[in-house]
């Protein structure tokens, strides 16, 4: 991958810790990483246990002045961001610079809806988790601990998927028309094609 290129990852169906570890390493190496669809990230273990863990984390606060921290993020993207932060030396200049190279998003807002999204096989649930094992969705966990935008994100995702379907249909139609056009003119241009092939201009 080119040095200045942005790596766009689709968080859906990836395990939280494994994905965070890989992302942390990449940002430390100097790559810019964007993680979309954070609400679709999975956590191993059943939902109830994960919720109890998060509720226990919500109780951790500074007794005399809770506004001083620790801060408890509710959005799935911020929960993932904090997980990555825990894997970085974020109190050093190097760690801070690495964290600035990471961008996390709920859903797939523009311009990332038009960009090619990658997956990380080493962090995929289907690869890493036995089919019988229980797992939880980060989006549901976030919603139950105070994230207010689950419905909004879901609606926007439905709209995006509909647009993508229309775009794909148009693309297929154009490809079909192009093939047909090529077939139609094949006989007319065959002699020119032969000349181009003999001169090595057409493979």
UniProtKB/Swiss-Prot annotation:
In-chain residues carrying the UniProt-annotated modification Phosphoserine: 77
Keyword Aminoacyl-tRNA synthetase recorded: no
Entry comment on modification after translation: Phosphorylation at Ser-77 upon interferon-gamma treatment in macrophages involves a DAPK1-DAPK3 kinase cascade and is causing release from the ribosome, association with the GAIT complex and subsequent involvement in transcript-selective translation inhibition. Citrullinated by PADI4.
Positions carrying Citrulline: 59, 140
PTM annotation (N6-acetyllysine): residues: 191
GO process terms (BP): cellular response to cAMP; cellular response to gamma radiation; cellular response to type II interferon; cellular response to UV-B; homeostatic process; lung morphogenesis; macrophage chemotaxis; negative regulation of formation of translation preinitiation complex
Keywords: Acetylation, Citrullination, Cytoplasm, Phosphoprotein, Ribonucleoprotein, Ribosomal protein, Translation regulation
CDD domains assigned to the protein according to its UniProt record, in alphabetical order: Ribosomal_L13
A GO CC term attached to the entry: GAIT complex
Keyword Cytoplasm assigned: yes
Pfam families per UniProt: Ribosomal_L13
Subcellular location: Cytoplasm
Molecular-function annotations in GO: mRNA binding; structural constituent of ribosome
InterPro entries per record: Ribosomal_uL13, Ribosomal_uL13_CS, Ribosomal_uL13_euk/arc, Ribosomal_uL13_sf
Transmembrane residue ranges: none
Gene3D superfamilies named among the record's database cross-references: 6.10.250.3250, Ribosomal protein L13
Highest taxon listed in the record's lineage: Eukaryota
Signal sequence interval, chain numbering: none
Function recorded in the entry: Associated with ribosomes but is not required for canonical ribosome function and has extra-ribosomal functions. Component of the GAIT (gamma interferon-activated inhibitor of translation) complex which mediates interferon-gamma-induced transcript-selective translation inhibition in inflammation processes. Upon interferon-gamma activation and subsequent phosphorylation dissociates from the ribosome and assembles into the GAIT complex which binds to stem loop-containing GAIT elements in the 3'-UTR of diverse inflammatory mRNAs (such as ceruplasmin) and suppresses their translation.
Subunit structure: Component of the 60S ribosome. Component of the GAIT complex. Interacts with EIF4G1.
NCBIfam families: L13_A_E (TIGR01077)
Family to which the UniProt record says this protein belongs: Belongs to the universal ribosomal protein uL13 family.
PANTHER family in the record: LARGE RIBOSOMAL SUBUNIT PROTEIN UL13, RIBOSOMAL PROTEIN L13
Protein name, UniProt field: Large ribosomal subunit protein uL13
Species of origin: Rattus norvegicus (Rat)
Name of the gene this protein is made from: Rpl13a
């Amino acid at each position: 991958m080119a040095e200045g290129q942005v790596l766009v990852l689709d968080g859906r169906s990836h395990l939280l810790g494994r994905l965070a570890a890989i992302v942390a390493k990449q940002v430390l190496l100097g790559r810019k990483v964007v993680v979309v669809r954070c609400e679709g990230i999975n956590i191993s273990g059943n939902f109830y246990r994960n919720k109890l863990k998060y509720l226990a984390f919500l109780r951790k606060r500074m007794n005399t002045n809770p506004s001083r921290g620790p801060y408890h993020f509710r959005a799935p993207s911020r929960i993932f961001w904090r997980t990555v932060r825990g894997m970085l030396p974020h109190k050093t200049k190097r760690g801070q610079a690495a964290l600035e190279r990471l961008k996390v998003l709920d859903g797939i807002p523009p311009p990332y809806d038009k960009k090619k999204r990658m997956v990380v096989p080493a962090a995929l649930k289907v690869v890493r988790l036995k089919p019988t094992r229980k797992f939880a969705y980060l989006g549901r966990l976030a919603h139950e601990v105070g994230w207010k935008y689950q419905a909004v994100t879901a609606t926007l995702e439905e709209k995006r998927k509909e647009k993508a379907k229309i775009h794909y249909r148009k693309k297929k139609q154009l490809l079909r028309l192009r093939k047909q056009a090529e077939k139609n003119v094949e006989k007319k241009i065959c002699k020119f094609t032969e000349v181009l092939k003999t001169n090595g201009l057409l493979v």
